[in-house]
A protein has these predicted regions:
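Conserved beta-alpha-beta core of the PfkB/ribokinase-like small-molecule kinase fold
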Residues: 1-49, 56, 66
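Conserved phosphate-binding/catalytic region of the ribokinase-like
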Residues: 43-159
Length: 159
């Protein structure tokens, strides 16, 4: 089970949120919300706090700085895919989450390696989102564009 939360639930329905997190496998959360939930500025500590609430993994979205996957045994940070023209960042985090969850649903691989691959997919999907307003770019997106950007991103990350 995957959950995405925000400050509204943290400040307004904290007990219900914590009860929900106990039943969740993966929490996807923005960095500011992770800090609010944990009362920790350090995101590594915030991630560990989240794991103590029940999830086996936390995905902390960090906006233009990418995202971090936190598990009991590891941390994995993925940068945001570099985009030359950012038109509107609204919804990029949701597009990241959609790419992440979509990859896991399609592949069925929730191992640490599978989660890392899902992080890469999420970053790529978010990069398309910021290229236009609303969901326009995503609506006209073709699979070969995704695959091409994934290949480019993997090459950037290799050294």
């Amino acid at each position: 089970t995957i959950c995405d939360t925000m400050d509204f639930w943290i400040s307004g329905k904290r007990k219900a949120l914590e009860a929900t997190l106990f039943k969740v496998d993966i929490l996807i959360i923005y960095d500011c919300a992770a800090r609010q939930l944990s009362n920790e500025y350090n995101l590594a500590k915030a991630g560990q706090y989240i794991l103590d609430l029940g999830p086996r993994a936390a995905v902390i979205k960090r906006g233009e700085h990418g995202a971090t996957l936190v598990t009991r045994d590891s941390y994995f940070a993925v940068p945001a895919f570099p985009v030359l023209t950012v038109t509107d960042p609204t919804g990029a985090g949701d597009s990241f989450a959609g790419g992440f969850v979509g990859y896991l649903a399609r592949e069925g691989d929730t191992s640490d390696t599978g989660l890392k691959r899902a992080m890469i997919r999420g970053s790529v999907m978010a990069s398309f989102n910021v290229e236009d307003f609303s969901v326009r770019r995503l609506e006209m997106l073709e699979n070969h564009e995704i695959e091409s950007r994934l290949e480019s991103f993997m090459e950037m990350l290799r050294f």
